């Protein structure tokens, strides 16, 4: 295939998929060359759209509309839009340090242009139409607080962030797609990982009252603005909280050694729900379990009549490598294992999960806010990953769980849409991606084969442990923590000037052309994934 043919291919693929889903309207839309200036934020009492979307509420273990009809929330998450992540967008390190490096290298004005264009192209009306035509009923939008509030000006809210969110809310309203607002990156960081825009490996939200005050106040502001917007299905008030490892990930406080601080998380969740209810009595509020949405059994019983709960349900066969059903070989920092997985084991995994048990015991809805499979491992194993995902969704459906996949769009890892490898953006960052892969900076991608740098890091972790001489420290967990600290956080941030330098000296027109690679019509659909999701999304509630 010639380069010209490769560049035309994503549009052809997009239009083929549009025809498959009935989305012929997609063919006529293009992203603007220059974004319109943001308009004023709509008032909280803005009228509903012509779609007559209805407020949703909790009724026992179900979610229903105003007439009491059952509603099933099925959809995805546009991670990488208003909360960037390294493996989704292609950059190294955390978003806020990347923005600082881009401003340093490109200058503040050109860096601002870069990020605004990325936001313009990454998720817009074309994407909303695409999702509706696949059958999605909801989109969970991950948000970084920095779009709405600056650390230098706490409690002063930025209309630019609300205006951008409002624009997408209007698109969703016009096309009948419900929205769940997800605070993915909170003030002071609710966990110690990169996906909360954290470059420090510490978490301050749980111990610093000023961060808690700002977090609660921001949610009150969201609720004040959107109290009368039926397009919003609810508020996911905190993504993947981790209430009790504020010093960072260490072998003694992760995985089976993690112990939630139930007093902290129960207190903060009660406070934020109370503050929201002062201005918004109608929207569902979703609470995620502690320890990255996995632990629930220390939660208070539901204390509001419109609460639902959210777990995350990533499973080994969705990542591989290996066959499904059959033997899967999950990788760790110190080697690979072997596990047998099939439908029955996936079902046991789901039914044994604390989120499943808690919601059953308390007669409240369960929403699996994140789960997914990956497609950048061995290409011949992609059918195995799809079979695992298909079985997983079938289990959710049989048990009445609502669900949203992770992730909607990315650079070729797990998205419904992926950037074309021949696109201007992917060609420009190709060498950097190879360096990232060699250095193991994307901590998420643990399923890929180890590189010499990863092996050397594991050896270093072993040498550290040998000198420390504490036999109680698990070698695998130690290697995992050393790798994350050294490669994801330190090395990822170290590489950010290299990423910024790739865009130095470009005109705004050139930059716009490169970033248009993120537009829906230039992306390549993952047809296998879309077909699996559409099969379930199109089903009645």
Describe each PLM feature range.
Residues 1-10, 17, 21-24, 34-37:
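N-terminal secretory signal peptides
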Residues 28-53:
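C-terminal segment of N-terminal export signals and the immediately downstream linker at the start
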Residues 44-136:
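N-terminal carbohydrate-binding accessory modules
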Residues 58, 189-335, 354-374, 398-404:
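Active-site region of glycoside hydrolase catalytic domains
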Residues 92-114, 154-159, 191-209, 252:
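Aromatic- and acidic-residue-enriched carbohydrate-binding clefts of CAZyme catalytic domains
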Residues 112-118, 151-162, 201-212, 256-263, ...:
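The substrate-binding groove and active-site-proximal loops of carbohydrate-active enzymes
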Residues 117-137, 156-185, 197-234:
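An active-site-proximal structural segment forming one wall of the substrate-binding cleft
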Residues 378-541:
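Aromatic-rich peripheral "rim/lid" segments of glycoside hydrolase catalytic domains that contact
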């Amino acid at each position: 295939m010639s380069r010209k043919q490769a560049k035309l291919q994503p549009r052809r693929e997009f239009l083929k998929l549009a025809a498959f889903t009935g989305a012929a309207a997609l063919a006529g839309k293009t992203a603007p060359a220059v974004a319109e200036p943001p308009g004023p934020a709509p008032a909280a009492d803005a009228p509903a759209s012509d779609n007559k979307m209805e407020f949703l509420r909790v009724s026992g273990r179900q979610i229903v509309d105003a007439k009491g009809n059952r509603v099933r929330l099925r959809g995805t998450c546009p991670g990488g839009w208003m909360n960037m992540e390294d493996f989704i967008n292609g950059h190294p390190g955390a978003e806020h340090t990347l923005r600082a490096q881009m401003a340093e290298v490109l200058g503040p004005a050109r860096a601002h242009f870069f990020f605004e264009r990325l936001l313009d192209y990454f998720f817009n009306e074309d994407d909303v139409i695409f999702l509706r035509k696949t059958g999605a009923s909801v989109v969970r939008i991950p948000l970084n607080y920095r779009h709405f509030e600056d650390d230098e000006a706490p409690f002063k809210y930025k209309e630019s962030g609300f205006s951008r969110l409002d624009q997408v809310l209007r698109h969703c309203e016009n096309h009948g797609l419900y929205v769940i607002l997800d605070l993915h990156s909170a003030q002071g960081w609710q966990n110690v990982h990169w996906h909360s825009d954290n470059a420090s490996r510490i978490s301050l939200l749980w111990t610093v009252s000023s961060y808690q005050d700002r977090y609660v106040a921001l949610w009150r502001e969201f609720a004040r603005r959107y109290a009368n917007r039926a397009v919003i299905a609810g508020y996911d008030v905190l993504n993947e909280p981790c209430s009790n490892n504020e010093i960072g990930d260490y072998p003694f406080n992760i995985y089976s050694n993690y112990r939630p601080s139930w007093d902290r998380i129960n207190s903060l969740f009660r406070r934020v729900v109370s503050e929201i209810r002062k201005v918004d009595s109608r929207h569902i509020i979703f609470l995620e379990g502690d320890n990255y949405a996995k632990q629930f059994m220390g939660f208070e019983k539901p204390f509001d009549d419109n609460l639902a709960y959210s777990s995350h349900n990533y499973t080994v066969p969705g990542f591989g490598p290996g066959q499904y059903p059959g033997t899967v070989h999950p990788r760790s920092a110190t080697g690979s294992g072997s596990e047998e997985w099939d439908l029955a084991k996936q079902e046991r995994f789901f039914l044994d999960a604390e989120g499943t048990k808690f919601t059953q015991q308390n007669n409240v809805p369960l929403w699996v806010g994140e789960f997914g499979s990956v497609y950048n491992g061995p290409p011949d194993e992609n059918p195995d990953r799809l079979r695992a995902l298909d079985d997983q969704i079938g289990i959710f459906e049989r048990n009445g769980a609502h669900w949203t996949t992770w992730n909607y769009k990315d650079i070729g890892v797990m998205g419904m849409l992926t950037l074309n490898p021949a696109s201007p953006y992917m060609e420009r960052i190709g060498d950097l991606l190879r360096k990232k892969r060699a250095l193991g900076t994307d901590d998420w991608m643990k399923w890929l084969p180890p590189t010499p740098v990863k092996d050397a890091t594991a050896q270093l972790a072993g040498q550290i442990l040998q000198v420390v001489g504490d036999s109680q420290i698990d070698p695998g967990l130690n290697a995992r923590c050393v790798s994350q600290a050294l490669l994801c956080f330190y090395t990822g941030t170290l590489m950010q000037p290299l990423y910024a330098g790739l865009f130095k000296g470009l005109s705004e027109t050139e930059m716009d052309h490169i970033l248009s690679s993120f537009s829906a019509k230039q992306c390549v659909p993952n047809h296998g994934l879309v077909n699996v999701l559409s099969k379930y999304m199109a089903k009645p509630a």
